[in-house]
Each structure stands twice: as C-alpha cells, then as structure tokens.
C-alpha cells in the first residue's frame, strides 16, 4: 500500500529472538516492542522524517510550546541510532520554533539516559527517583532530605556531562505508575 517504508518491516529472521514483532505473513514481520497494535516507526526513512516534520510544524504553528516524547528507548534498534534521531528531531523542531521544549520518557538505566542527552534534548524524566519506592518519596517518609539532595545533585551532575543545558525532569509519579498520594496517605 506504499506505507511499508514508514515502519520497521523486514524478513522475520532479521529480528533478534527477544524483539517483539507482528507477523505479516510470507516470512515478513514488523517490529512492535511497545504493543502489538503499535508498530515501530522506521526512523531512518526520509518519508517518516518528512511526516514527523509536518506533524511538529502543524502543532507548533497552533501554539504548542513543546513535546513529550513517549518511550524514547525504542528510538534505538538494529539500524537506528536513537541519539542521532532525537538530535535530528530536536534540531528540526528548534528550526521551526527556537524556544521549543522537549522532554523524553525513558524507562531505562542512567547510561542510556545519558546517551540520549547527547542529542541536546532539554529534559528526560528521572524515573529512578519516582514511585512510592523511589528516592524522593522514600526519603520524604524517612526524613532523609540531605540524602535526597545529594542523590539528585549527583544524578544532575552525571546527566549534564552529556548535555550541559539539560533540565532533569524530576517527578513523583505519572499515568503509568501508582499515584504518589497512595504512598503518602498513610504517613
């Protein structure tokens, strides 16, 4: 139908055994790490990037000041350098609106987050500090304010090594997690 170039479609044997895919028949599959209903974009495709540019421009022209990018860790696969793509998209949006703000959701370890900060992106959510068992709430409950401050400062220093302008996005919880109020209500 002419849309195959937009997605990560390959011979099924191309994918690693732990990669989630959607079988397309005739020996082909489409990468779908997040959900069987959500195929992965081919982020190396010129057509895909043209569409991303049009979509960003559409929303920026209507007054949107920034973007929250869901599941950034899936921007990287066998043939896609997630940092390169993120840099391209960030620079593209900055070309449309100089002061656009971009925050990435990246449920992964510090080294992956640090790598994506090399793209220049403004912020990434600091998941290790969130949830009822994360650093912030745990230390609020135990009254460990100084320990929390030191952990956040060390994290911030580590991330700004990759991007001196990084604004780490600390938060307590989001729509994918148990709400922070549940952890604090008994305190």
Identify what each model region corresponds to:
Residues 1-4, 54-57, 65-168, 185:
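Active-site-proximal helices and loops of the catalytic beta/alpha 8
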Residues 39-42, 72-77, 178-187:
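Active-site rim elements
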Residues 1-62, 89-95, 112-113, 131-135:
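Substrate-binding/active-site clefts of carbohydrate-active enzymes
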Residues 172:
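Conserved N-terminal catalytic/coupling substructures associated with nucleotide/phosphate chemistry
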């Amino acid at each position: 139908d002419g849309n195959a170039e937009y997605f990560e479609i390959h011979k099924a044997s191309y994918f690693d055994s732990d990669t989630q895919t959607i079988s397309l028949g005739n020996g082909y599959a489409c990468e779908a790490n997040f959900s069987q209903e959500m195929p992965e974009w081919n982020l190396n495709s010129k057509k895909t990037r043209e569409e991303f540019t049009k979509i960003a421009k559409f929303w920026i022209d209507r007054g949107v000041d920034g973007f929250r990018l869901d599941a950034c860790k899936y921007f990287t696969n066998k043939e896609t350098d997630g940092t390169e793509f993120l840099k391209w998209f960030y620079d593209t949006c900055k070309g449309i609106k100089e002061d656009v703000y971009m925050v990435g959701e990246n449920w992964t370890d510090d080294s992956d987050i640090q790598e994506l900060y090399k793209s220049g992106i403004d912020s990434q959510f600091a998941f290790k500090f969130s949830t009822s068992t994360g650093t912030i709430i745990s230390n609020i409950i135990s009254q460990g304010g100084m320990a929390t401050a030191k952990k956040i400062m060390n994290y911030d220093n580590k991330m700004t090594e990759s991007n001196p302008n990084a604004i780490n996005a600390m938060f307590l919880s989001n729509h994918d997690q148990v709400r922070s109020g549940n952890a604090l209500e008994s305190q």
